[in-house]
Each structure stands twice: as structure tokens, then as C-alpha cells.
Amino acid sequence: MSLFDHSVSELHKKLNNKEISVTDLVEESYKRIADVEDNVKAFLTLDEENARAKAKELDAKIGAEDNGLLFGMPIGVKDNIVTNGLRTTCASKMLANFDPIYDATVVQKLKAADTITIGKLNMDEFAMGSSNENSGFYATKNPWNLDYVPGGSSGGSAAAVAAGEVLFSLGSDTGGSIRQPAAYCGVVGLKPTYGRVSRYGLVAFASSLDQIGPITRTVEDNAYLLQAISGLDRMDATSANVEVGNYLAGLTGDVKGLRIAVPKEYLGEGVGEEARESVLAALKVLEGMGATWEEVSLPHSKYALATYYLLSSSEASANLSRFDGVRYGVRSDNVNNLLDLYKNTRSEGFGDEVKRRIMLGTFALSSGYYDAYYKKAQQVRTLIKNDFENVFANYDVIIGPTTPTPAFKVGEKVDDPMTMYANDILTIPVNLAGVPAISVPCGFGANNMPLGLQIIGKHFDEATIYRVAHAFEQATDYHTKKASL
């Protein structure tokens, strides 16, 4: 039995009782990585020397009264979250040798909580992708079946947790990039409310959509991690000055009287039968615990995919303009003038999907097209946000599938961008509205691949999401299933 089969609270108790050491936890992580990483390929960079030194330092503090619940816990960090002195590449050749000189705010907070960073996790390049096949280095595989994708863009973050390489991880979510891989890999992933968690130190893809969030084995562990990384940060102008409640207090298993909305659009066209049936079964479980549910409509969600790709690509076009060979990242040697430097550096440094989105965004922002595309997309975004607010006026949470289907095979959709984009049709509206949502395991589909239940909440009401997710988790055993890697 792996130490990582235990929850954070159980491991914390074992540490305090000196049944295990922090070094034991770190070695457990690196041993598992040595055993499975050649197949899973979840990590891009390991930090073994520093992790072992930190573990030895923390071992001397075991039993101290001020040790928090995350004391000594091994974590993996998505490779678009900067880590001081530890290579951060965004899975792009553009940043292949970039060593940051500061820590992201979330990393600072986790260091203050005495977690130990095991390494940096693979992803789709600059977080653009839904399968991890867009990594500039190599594709991560799904621990449940190595022939299948782990999802993206936080595929490495989800796969590492599912494979037992780390206890938990950090990912980022712009259009579903935490929740979708969490669903595909049978783990728990939460996208917080926009502004709940600081984005300082997150390499920007689409600044109005990006959020950092936790990926874990259980809902309780997820709540611990969000508690640690949430809160106002003066270094991030979009960070919200909203009180962070006690997320653990609501994990009672009680959902009696809870009002659940189920959008008909989330169970309709484009959603597979396996995903639909798993959600209906989950609703029966919650109904049996005293919750009620009704069908509702989010009428503008059908426009979410087009809206998202116009807006996110436009923001990406602006954000990635800084990578030009002058200051950040690689620099092409094949140059005769400044124009060559810009063109050749970006042509050589960026992958195909990143180039595709930069082109789309530049087009949408160009003279003559701004009003026709970008401005109208912003107006539709407002309508989508209003749809959610209208539903939340009468309901506590919205529930549906996280993804239309279970994970697909490696290489199956890589040559068809539109089919690939459609994997995120159920997660994208949440980012456009800025509301929080979690994916929890809710069953299995074809070839024993996991399915996820998406629970969406009101702005800054992560507590209710956790309450529902925890109650469902405790009433089922999906979270106890493990990939037999």
C-alpha cells in the first residue's frame, strides 16, 4: 500500500506520531516516479536534490505545534507556474531553458505551509490544448490506459496524481484545463472563482480566464490545498478581496434541501450516452440524500465554444507577443535583421497549436474585424454570465458531465482541431462566467476509462461545491478506484 493512498489528514497524523518521516514521503514520490515515469511522462523537471534537503530539514521539526496540515506533503507544480531557480518551460521550446528568479504567489504560499515541490509537470504548450499532445517535448499518457490521453492542458498534473507519483498537484484552468484532465484521469480537480487565487507568477494564456487550482485524490484534500493558496494578493490586480472561508467546515455529508439545476444543454446534443447516464445516476444518489433537482436552460451556452476561442486566442496573441527573441526565451541564430529575429524566433520556438491561436487572435483584433468578432464575443460572454446568474437566483449548484465522453486514444483527434476543441464544450462556459466548478469521479465508460461529474457554484461559493462533491464522494466508491499502472 502506498503512503499516498492515505489522505492529507491521515498522513499529518502519522507524521505527528512519528510513524513516518517527511523523507519517507519524498522517497515514496521519487520511487514511484522511477517505477512509472518512463510510461506516464507526467514530469518535465524534477527537483530531487532540493526536495531531499528540505525533507531532512522538516524531519527535525516533526511534532512541532505550529506544523500545519500540509507540512511535509509532496506536490507537483504545472510548468506554467514559475518556481524560483527551477526550470519553467510552459512545455515549449520557446522557454526550454528558462529559470525564473522568483516564485509565483501560490508557490510562496505552499512553501510557507512547508510543502515540498517534487518537480514541474508536463502540459500542452502554453496551456493550449485538451490532450497533452501539444507539449513541445513529449506527450503525457493516461495512467488508466497508456493508449489514451490524460486530457489537457494540465494533463501532467492529473496523471501524476492518478499514477500516485505525488499526493496532489497544481494546475491552471482557462477553458477546462483542470477539470477535463481530472475527469479523464479519475481524480478531483477544482477551478476556483476568477480572482479567488492569485495569478501572479502564472505565465499568461488568456488573462481574463486563467485560474490556478488544485488536483487531488479526494475532495477533502482538494479543500485543504485551496485553503492554502486562496486569498487577496496585491501583486495581482485581478485578485479579489473576498474572505476565504473554512472549506473543511462544510464537509459534513449533508445535502438535505439542496437545490440542484441540471441544464438541458449539458445532457443534449454532443454529449455521449455514458456521460449522460453517469450524471443521472449521480443525481439519484444526491436525491436519495435529500437534495432536489430540476431541468433548466443555459440558452447561450451553445455559443460558448466560438466565444471562448475568439476571446482566449485574442488574449493569447497579446500575451505571447513578448516572446520575440529580444529578452525572453530562445533566440534564433538564423537572422540578418530585426524582422528576421522576430519571425524566425517565433517560427522556431512555438508549436503548431500556439501558432494557430496566435493567428486567430491577431485576426480577431485586427482593424476592420475587432467590432465584428472580438467585441461581439465579449457581448456574448456577458449573456453567458447572465444565464448563470439567472439560474443561481433559484438554485444552489448546477450539475452536469465534465466532458462529453471518456478519454480518447492518443493520436485520435490531433489532426482535427475542431473535434479536439469540442472536448471542452461543457467546461468553457464556466470560465466565461468566472464561476467556480469541480470535477469528481462518477463512473467509468468504455475500456474502463473514468468519467467526471461537474458541480458548478455561485461566485466565491466554493464551500457549497465542496459540500456537494464530498457528500457524493462519501456515498460512492469511485474515488477509491486506482489506475492499475
UniProtKB/Swiss-Prot annotation:
Keyword field: ATP-binding, Ligase, Nucleotide-binding, Protein biosynthesis
Catalyzed reaction equations: L-glutamyl-tRNA(Gln) + L-glutamine + ATP + H2O = L-glutaminyl-tRNA(Gln) + L-glutamate + ADP + phosphate + H(+)
Keyword Protein biosynthesis: yes
Cited SUPFAM superfamilies: Amidase signature (AS) enzymes
One GO BP annotation of this record: translation
Residues of the active site: 78, 153, 177
GO molecular function, one term: glutaminyl-tRNA synthase (glutamine-hydrolyzing) activity
Any single GO CC term annotated in Swiss-Prot or TrEMBL for this entry: glutamyl-tRNA(Gln) amidotransferase complex
Top-rank EC class of the record's enzyme: ligase
Listed EC numbers: 6.3.5.7
Function: Allows the formation of correctly charged Gln-tRNA(Gln) through the transamidation of misacylated Glu-tRNA(Gln) in organisms which lack glutaminyl-tRNA synthetase. The reaction takes place in the presence of glutamine and ATP through an activated gamma-phospho-Glu-tRNA(Gln).
Quaternary structure note: Heterotrimer of A, B and C subunits.
Family to which this protein belongs: Belongs to the amidase family. GatA subfamily.
The protein's name: Glutamyl-tRNA(Gln) amidotransferase subunit A
Lineage: Bacteria, Bacillati, Bacillota, Bacilli, Bacillales
